[in-house]
């Protein structure tokens, strides 16, 4: 279920402060964050945000199509290695 419109979008304050500081200074260095629950705001466009996926920080370059989505959507937490192959079917 989406968030109520009367509440508005959510962003962690510490991340918002880092984004505003980077926009003011024009710094292009990636912003490291563990806040996967924060919503992408329009003032983040053009910044690189390193989102933690549980093991490492995944660099995410924010574009205008990402606005309104959560940061965690762009840093997958699970790796899919495929199902085990059936050895009987391979011999035929």
From Swiss-Prot:
One of its GO terms (biological process) is ribosomal small subunit assembly. Keywords: Ribonucleoprotein, Ribosomal protein, RNA-binding, rRNA-binding. GO terms for molecular function: rRNA binding; structural constituent of ribosome. The keyword Nucleotidyltransferase does not apply. The keyword Glycoprotein does not apply. It holds the Pfam family Ribosomal_S19. GO terms for cellular component: cytoplasm; small ribosomal subunit. Protein S19 forms a complex with S13 that binds strongly to the 16S ribosomal RNA. NCBIfam families: rpsS_bact. Belongs to the universal ribosomal protein uS19 family. HAMAP family: Ribosomal_uS19. This is Small ribosomal subunit protein uS19. The lineage of its organism: Bacteria, Pseudomonadati, Pseudomonadota, Gammaproteobacteria, Enterobacterales. The gene is rpsS.
């Amino acid at each position: 279920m989406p968030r109520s419109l009367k509440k508005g979008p959510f962003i962690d304050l510490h991340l918002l402060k880092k984004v505003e500081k980077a926009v003011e200074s024009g710094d292009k260095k990636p912003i490291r964050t563990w806040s996967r629950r924060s919503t992408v705001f329009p003032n983040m466009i053009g910044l690189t945000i390193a989102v933690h996926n549980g093991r490492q920080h995944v660099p995410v370059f924010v574009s205008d199509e990402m606005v309104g989505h959560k940061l965690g959507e762009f840093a997958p937490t699970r790796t899919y290695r495929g199902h085990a192959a059936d050895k009987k079917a391979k011999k035929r």
